[in-house]
Amino acid sequence: MTVTDIASRTYNHGWRLDPIVRSLLDTDFYKLLMLQMIREFYPDQKVTFSVINRTKRVRLGDVIDEGELRAQLDHARTIRFSKKELIWLAGNTFYGKTHMFSPDFLAWLANFRLPEYELHKADGQYELHFHGLWTHTTMWEIPALAIVNELRSRQAMKGQGRFALDVLFARAKAKLWAKVERLRKLEGLRLSDFGTRRRHGFLWQRWCVEAVKEGLGSSFTGTSNVLLAMDNDLEAIGTNAHELPMVAAALAKDDDELRFAPYRILDQWRQTYAGNLLIALPDAFGTKAFLRDAPDWVADWTGFRPDSAPPIQAGEEIIAWWKSKGRDPRQKLLVFSDAMDVESIEQIHQRFSDQVRLSFGWGTNLTNDFVGCSPDGSVDLDPISLVCKVTSVDGRPAVKLSDNPEKATGDPAEIARYLRVFGDAGRVRTPVFV
């Protein structure tokens, strides 16, 4: 394995276009899994995705050159799935299952391209939207976020000398390795990379994945990044995301349909994957509401991915719910992935490792932790909270309530309606950093 000298490559960067996204597999695995289901059940649905910068103090419109942003987005639209990539998707085993993707779906992917985008500036921020069929706009989420984040990183490093860059990356590497040394001590740890969307850059994510693979050995279970999984012979990790219940809810004709929407689309997911990949994401409209109204069959699923509630609180609540349904939590799985870092992983592991099966998705704090690493003390490389969410479905506003009101998205009037239907119980406002 050849280790890239990232500092030298950054210093020598001077060509007209250094593509940030070079493959459509440079995305999260669950985007492909969801895409296959979307194409089956919602082939004609029109859905808009929008990039949202929750870190308002960082004025991306002032930091990132619009011409460079357009060039990267335009380049991404030229990429197609390669024959090699499609053969790998067809022949690889995912979660112990062969032929995860149907021949018809893979044939359709062969002609796939990202749709057009809409971009303009307002109040120092970029407004970046993707309109069109859900089968196409969904695939913009990860490359759009990766492009914006890496352009910001490149801008922050412009003008730094060769040795300053060398020190920057040396400190970041040492910082990550110190985390690895702590995580090694956790018996039975299962951890994967979830850091594509808000990474510092592709080369840095690749270095992090290769380092953690060596440092944690069998405790490192894989990566959500499909390209890195293919290139490094790792498991591709992922199930589903908030966009599924958000779209289903936006399509609901009345409040009763709205209340049942999260379960209807999970049932469609179950049909698509024949009982595999049964990890539910409960917090789109509040975890308490999800558990309160869940059909009994949800308790038979493999587990949950608590995403926005305080993790200890969420874990306790879900374990209690399983017990109330007569299920043994020790046979169930909790996947924690919300802003995980070494301290929170240690705390959750200590609290729950003897009560339930645990897995961790390590995201931004794995692939973009340069806090305190800059030789000049700059904070321009500190990570920001950047998301790409469904904002409308067939012209109707989409909503995410979340267990944390700071993460809520949608039209205020629609948010109020959703709160009337789902309630506000269990929602806790906490600061969002990544």
Swiss-Prot record:
GO BP terms, alphabetized: NAD biosynthetic process via the salvage pathway
Protein's UniProt keywords contain Ligase: yes
Keyword Ligase belongs to the record: yes
InterPro entries (alphabetical): N/Namide_PRibTrfase, NAPRTase_N, Nic_PRibTrfase, Nic_PRibTrfase-Fam, Nicotinate_pribotase-like_C
Catalytic activity: nicotinate + 5-phospho-alpha-D-ribose 1-diphosphate + ATP + H2O = nicotinate beta-D-ribonucleotide + ADP + phosphate + diphosphate
Enzyme category, top tier: ligase
Disulfide bridge positions per record: none
Functional pathway: Cofactor biosynthesis; NAD(+) biosynthesis; nicotinate D-ribonucleotide from nicotinate: step 1/1
Gene Ontology molecular function: nicotinate phosphoribosyltransferase activity
EC number assigned by the record: 6.3.4.21
GO cellular component: cytosol
UniProt PTM comment: Transiently phosphorylated on a His residue during the reaction cycle. Phosphorylation strongly increases the affinity for substrates and increases the rate of nicotinate D-ribonucleotide production. Dephosphorylation regenerates the low-affinity form of the enzyme, leading to product release.
Keyword annotations of the record: Ligase, Phosphoprotein, Pyridine nucleotide biosynthesis
Modified residues (Phosphohistidine): 242
Protein family: Belongs to the NAPRTase family.
Its biological purpose: Catalyzes the synthesis of beta-nicotinate D-ribonucleotide from nicotinate and 5-phospho-D-ribose 1-phosphate at the expense of ATP.
NCBIfam families registered for this protein in UniProt: NAPRTase (TIGR01514), PRK05321.1 (NF003704)
HAMAP family, per database record: NAPRTase (MF_00570)
Protein name: Nicotinate phosphoribosyltransferase
Organism of provenance: Bradyrhizobium sp. (strain ORS 278)
